[in-house]
Amino acid sequence: MENTAASNSRPRLAGLKVLVIDDSKTIRRTAETLLSKEGCEVYTAVDGFDALSKIADHQPDIVFVDIMMPRLDGYQTCSLIKHNKVFRSIPVIMLSSKDGLFDRARGRIVGSEHYLTKPFTKEELLGAIETHIVR
């Protein structure tokens, strides 16, 4: 029996454009490393303002955004994405060190599709992508 993963030399998420927004360099680098190994084109931003220009420039397929950031937090960033007619269809995954019901509900209210608690695993990160991206 042939191992399809081994026989397919192209990474499973090749060419998928992902934006990771987090004020933590460690989180940005971790996500970038994990996703790049899967073939994703990864863009990073340090806050919501930085992210908005990168969304316009790169038009990512999916966005991961930290909730607690300076200047423009994750809720505000998600809301701005979801209220823009050009970008509203981009799935937004909230990232937080908090795992409270209120935080999850507030994320849903502003339009996020999913919520991951930090620190996240490779499987959680890839699972969120596979759940929300139809390829």
Where are these regions (language model features)?
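Non-catalytic signal-transmission and effector/linker regions of two-component phosphorelay proteins
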Residues: 1-17, 123-135
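Charged docking surfaces used in two-component/phosphorelay signaling
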Residues: 29-37
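Short hydrophobic/Thr-rich beta-strand motif most characteristic of the beta2 strand and flanking loop
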Residues: 39-46, 54
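Active-site beta3 strand of CheY-like receiver
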Residues: 58-64
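Receiver (REC) domain active-site loop signature in two-component systems and cognate sites
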Residues: 69
